[in-house]
């Protein structure tokens, strides 16, 4: 441990072996709170490399139980969170709609830290059992193409280190790891990050982890694709990483103000979700979710481009099938 700390104090990247050793010790609670705080802060100041992030994620996955084997190329759109802008749950609503369109969504997430409502909070408030056992999860997924994996059930180190991390008052490597440690190991990911400087690092980490297709985004300071500002994107495709910017015109959608996406409490997020699924949501809410669903369809080769993905999603919403789909998820999650 002393060698690892000294390397970080001198702002040196850790070797793969050192990262694996460090996170194995963290998993087994062999690192004191003082040491863990020092390590997280030193990593933050140095700047986490994509290798450190990917090896840490691999180590955590090696110790996480896999609930079932689907045999499919699963999709996740879990983001880092941490943008502090308190918007509606764009990615969670997008995952519900995408799964109602037949995409195999394995949604990894947790409760809110910086927002009014995290993915777990929203789903729980909608009536979904967020702590499904493996049998329930597999059954729900097989019948709805949607499964929610509540991160603390699979990664105890996240749960146990949460109080310490909260006291640091800063984002750490754990924010980066959250979207990378889905126990079902999705091969397609739409990953939002809280800072655009992380886009390339996270794209490289996804590539190192063996993800086939991905888009890492930061839109107007949020960890989502947005319509109110430019969305910076790094796309992983055919083992290459492409960098580009997106705006509302790329989706053939009008721009909306960020303020229209912000909410005051968790109940507002629940109502926004229900309204969107029933095709009666505010245009500003619906269209930003549609842009994110379109991106999932594009990454999954279900739409040839983003504009086609938008058209497909808007037509699907008219049927109100996503609302019926949610009711099925709720029922099966408790079965």
Swiss-Prot record:
Cofactor: Mg(2+)
Binding, 5-phospho-alpha-D-ribose 1-diphosphate: 79, 82-83, 87, 89-92, 107-115, 119
EC identifiers of the protein: 2.4.2.18
Keyword match Signal: no
Binding site for anthranilate 2: 165
Pathway: Amino-acid biosynthesis; L-tryptophan biosynthesis; L-tryptophan from chorismate: step 2/5
Top-level lineage group: Bacteria
UniProt key word DNA repair: no
Known catalytic reactions: N-(5-phospho-beta-D-ribosyl)anthranilate + diphosphate = 5-phospho-alpha-D-ribose 1-diphosphate + anthranilate
GO CC list: cytosol
GO MF annotations, alphabetized: anthranilate phosphoribosyltransferase activity; magnesium ion binding
Cofactor: binding details: Binds 2 magnesium ions per monomer.
Example of a GO biological process term: L-tryptophan biosynthetic process
Binding site for Mg(2+) 1: 91, 224
Amino-acid positions noted as binding anthranilate 1 in the UniProt annotation, renumbered to this chain: 79
SUPFAM superfamilies given in the database record: Nucleoside phosphorylase/phosphoribosyltransferase catalytic domain, Nucleoside phosphorylase/phosphoribosyltransferase N-terminal domain
Pfam families associated with the record: Glycos_trans_3N, Glycos_transf_3
Transmembrane segments: none
PANTHER family attached to this UniProt entry: ANTHRANILATE PHOSPHORIBOSYLTRANSFERASE
Family statement drawn from the similarity comment of this UniProt entry: Belongs to the anthranilate phosphoribosyltransferase family.
Its biological purpose: Catalyzes the transfer of the phosphoribosyl group of 5-phosphorylribose-1-pyrophosphate (PRPP) to anthranilate to yield N-(5'-phosphoribosyl)-anthranilate (PRA).
The protein's name: Anthranilate phosphoribosyltransferase
Organism whose genome encodes this protein: Helicobacter pylori (strain P12)
């Amino acid at each position: 441990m002393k060698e690892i700390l000294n390397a970080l104090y001198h702002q040196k990247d850790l070797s793969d072996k050192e990262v694996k050793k460090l996170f194995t010790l963290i998993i087994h609670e062999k690192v004191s709170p003082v040491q863990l705080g020092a390590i997280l802060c030193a990593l933050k100041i140095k700047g986490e490399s994509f290798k450190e992030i990917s090896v840490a994620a691999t180590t955590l996955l090696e110790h996480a139980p896999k609930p079932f084997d689907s045999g499919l190329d699963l999709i996740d759109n879990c983001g880092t969170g941490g943008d502090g802008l308190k918007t509606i749950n764009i990615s969670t609503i997008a995952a519900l709609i995408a799964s109602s369109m037949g995409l195999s969504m394995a949604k990894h997430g947790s409760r809110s830290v910086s927002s009014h409502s995290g993915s777990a909070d929203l789903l729980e408030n909608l009536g979904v059992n967020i702590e499904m056992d493996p049998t329930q999860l597999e059954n729900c997924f097989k019948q709805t193409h949607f499964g929610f994996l509540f991160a603390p059930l699979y990664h105890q180190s996240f749960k146990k280190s949460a109080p310490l991390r909260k006291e640091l008052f800063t984002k750490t490597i754990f924010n980066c790891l959250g979207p990378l440690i889905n126990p079902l190991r999705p091969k397609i990911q739409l990953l939002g990050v809280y800072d655009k400087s992380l886009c390339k690092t996270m794209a490289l980490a996804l590539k190192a982890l063996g993800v086939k297709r991905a888009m890492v985004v930061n839109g107007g300071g949020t960890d989502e694709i947005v319509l109110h500002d430019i969305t910076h994107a790094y796309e992983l495709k055919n083992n290459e990483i492409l960098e580009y910017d997106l705006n509302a015109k790329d989706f053939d959608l009008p721009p909306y103000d960020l303020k229209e996406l912000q909410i005051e409490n968790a109940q507002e997020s629940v109502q926004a979700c229900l309204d969107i699924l029933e095709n009666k949501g505010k245009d500003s809410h619906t269209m930003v979710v549609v842009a994110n669903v379109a991106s999932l369809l594009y990454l999954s080769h279900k739409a040839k481009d983003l504009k086609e993905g938008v058209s497909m999603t808007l037509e699907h919403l008219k049927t109100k099938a996503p609302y019926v789909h949610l009711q099925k998820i709720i029922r099966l999650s408790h079965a």
